[in-house]
Design a protein with these regions (language model features):
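A glycine-rich helix->loop->beta "capping" turn
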Residues: 69-82, 88
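Conserved glycine-rich cofactor-binding loop
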Residues: 11-12
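SDR active-site lid
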Residues: 168-236
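Residue(s) in the substrate-gating loop at a strand-loop-helix junction
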Residues: 135
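Substrate-binding pocket helix/loop in short-chain dehydrogenase/reductase
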Residues: 91-92, 99-101
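The beta1-alpha1 cofactor-binding region of Rossmann-like NAD(H)/NADP(H)-dependent oxidoreductases
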Residues: 55-65, 97
Length: 272
C-alpha cells in the first residue's frame, strides 16, 4: 500500500537518502527543505510522487502551512519524519547564548512545530506514525557535543511523552537513534562551531582525531531499517542504528545501573 511520507531536512544526509528510497519503492514523499532547488533533479525524476516544499522548521506558521499543503496534495500524511537539525561543537564554557538558542530552536522547537501541525490531521485519520530523528548522543554524551546532546536529550523526553499521549488515537511514535554515520554532518551546513577557548584545544584535537578514525556507518544501509520501521504494525519506541552505537549505549546503561545500585542506600534514606 502506498504511503505518504513527510520528511523535513530532505535535501541531504539521511533525509535525502530516505526520500529517494521511499520514492523508488512507490511511496509519495513530501520533502520539506530550506532550499527547494537542491531537489530539482529528483523532482524531474518523480514529478507525481514527490512534492517539494520550502520550509524553515523554526517558523511555526510555515510548518502548519506545510502540513496543510501536503494534505491538499496527497489527501493525508501517513508518516512524519522529523529529520531536520544540525550539530554544534564547543565546550560548555564556550557556548554563546545565540549558539544555545539557535540549536534548540532548530532541533527541538522545529520538531515540535511539525508534530503539533500534523497531530490534528493524524487524529482525524485515526492513524499515523511520527518518527523523530534523535541520536546515540541523546542517550549518552561526548566532550564538545554537550549542546547537541542537550537538544537530543530534550527530544528523547518530549517524544517518549508524546508516544504515551497519542497512543489512544491510533498514532505511533518512534525515536531513531543513529551512531556515527558517513554523512555530511561534520560539514559546514550541519555542524556549527562555537568561539574557542585555548584551554580546550587539546580536547578538540583528540575529538577530531577520534572522529577521523571511528568506524562510520554507511547511510544507505539504513534504508531497510526505515522501511521495516514504517511498515511495522507495532514499531518500537526506540530504534538504534549502527553497530557501534548499540554496545556504547548498552555499556552506558549498565554503568548507570551500577552507580544507582551502589548509591541506593543514600537514595532511599533521602526519602525521609
Amino acid at each position: 500500500m502506498t504511503k505518504t511520507i513527510f520528511i523535513t531536512g530532505a535535501s541531504r544526509g539521511f533525509g535525502r537518502i530516505w526520500a529517494e528510497a521511499f520514492l523508488q519503492r512507490g511511496d509519495n514523499v513530501v520533502a520539506a527543505v530550506r532550499q527547494p532547488e537542491t531537489l530539482k533533479e529528483l523532482a524531474k525524476e518523480f514529478p507525481v510522487n514527490l512534492f517539494v516544499l520550502q520550509l524553515d522548521v523554526t517558523d511555526k506558521k510555515a510548518s502548519f502551512e506545510a502540513i496543510e499543503a501536503a494534505k491538499a496534495r496527497f489527501g493525508g500524511i501517513d508518516v512524519l519524519i522529523n529529520n531536520a537539525g544540525y550539530g554544534q561543537i564547543g565546550a560548555v564554557e564556550e557556548l554563546s547564548e545565540q549558539d544555545v538558542r539557535s540549536q534548540f530552536e532548530t532541533n527541538v522547537l522545529g520538531s515540535l512545530w511539525t508534530i503539533q501541525a500534523a497531530l490534528p490531521l493524524m487524529r482525524a485519520q485515526k492513524s499515523g506514525h511520527i518518527i523523530q530523528l534523535s541520536s546515540a548522543l541523546g542517550l549518552n554524551t561526548v566532550t564538545l557535543m554537550g549542546l547537541y546532546s542537550a537538544t537530543k536529550f530534550a527530544i528523547e523526553g518530549m517524544t517518549e511523552t508524546l508516544a504515551a499521549e497519542v497512543s489512544d488515537f491510533g498514532i505511533k511514535v518512534s525515536l531513531v537513534e543513529p551512531g556515527r554515520y558517513d554523512t555530511d554532518f561534520s560539514g559546514s551546513h550541519s555542524l556549527a562551531r562555537s568561539e574557542s577557548i585555548s584551554v580546550y584545544d587539546n580536547m578538540r584535537k583528540v575529538f577530531w582525531d577520534y572522529a577521523d578514525q571511528e568506524d562510520s556507518g554507511k547511510p544507505a544501509a539504513t534504508v531497510n531499517a526505515l522501511f521495516a520501521l514504517v511498515d511495522s504494525q507495532e514499531p518500537p519506541l526506540r530504534l538504534i542504528l549502527g553497530k557501534t552505537a548499540y554496545p556504547w549505549v548498552k555499556n552506558t546503561y549498565e554503568q548507570r545501573l551500577k552507580t544507582w545500585e551502589a548509591w541506593q542506600d543514600v537514595s532511599v534514606a533521602a526519602h525521609g
